[in-house]
Regions:
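Helical hinge/lid and interdomain linker segments adjacent to catalytic or ligand-binding clefts
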Residues: 5-7, 12-101
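A glycine-rich, often tryptophan-bearing local segment used as a flexible ligand/cofactor-contacting loop or short
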Residues: 66-145
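Secondary-structure boundary/capping signal
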Residues: 35-39, 117, 147
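C-terminal and late-domain segments of enzyme folds
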Residues: 42, 138-158
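Extreme N-terminal starter segment of soluble prokaryotic enzymes
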Residues: 1-3
Length: 158
């Protein structure tokens, strides 16, 4: 059995924007049918207890980035560094959580996931996506036209 820890950041934006807890709960709901996978959601920016890491296969963080990044609080970076570097714990960051200020946190994240969003260099435009036609492909089966507001990141620093 694999154990995935989903860490949702503290509320920080208006309703409907950067809904960290709701996003992680939705992701957990989608993953609960995966055979051999246990998913635990932790909110308020970190694990409910350090014991949660016991037996964990991977950690994913969906939270504010920059100076409010959960990895920069308390001993969080050191705790995960030991597990990622020495035990091979899987690690992922979602959306705003890929932004870290320059320093040890950014260097470690670069080593773990290959890069990070760098303030004043990377970009994150917001656009209205309107998808009217989808290709005939198995991955698009059952998907109909839709519109959404999308914020995407590019020029990530590797």
């Amino acid at each position: 059995m694999k154990k995935l820890l989903l860490i949702a950041g503290r509320p920080s934006h208006a309703l409907g924007a950067h809904e960290y807890r709701a996003g992680m709960l939705l992701l957990a709901q989608c993953l609960k049918a995966v055979p051999g996978l246990e998913v635990d959601v932790h909110d308020e920016g970190w694990l409910s207890s350090d014991d949660a890491l016991e037996g964990a296969s991977a950690v994913a963080i969906f939270a504010d980035g920059g100076v409010r990044h959960p990895l920069l609080e308390a001993d969080h970076l050191a705790t995960l560094s030991t597990l990622v570097d020495e035990r091979g714990l899987g690690f992922g960051l979602m959306h705003y959580a890929v932004e870290l200020p320059e320093g040890d946190g950014a260097r470690r994240v670069d080593a773990w996931i290959g890069g990070h969003y760098k303030d004043q260099v990377s970009c994150n435009p917001i656009w209205e996506a309107r998808v009217e036609q989808l290709p005939e492909h198995p991955v698009a089966r059952g998907v109909t036209s839709f519109a959404t507001t999308d914020e995407w990141y590019f020029d990530i620093q590797f």
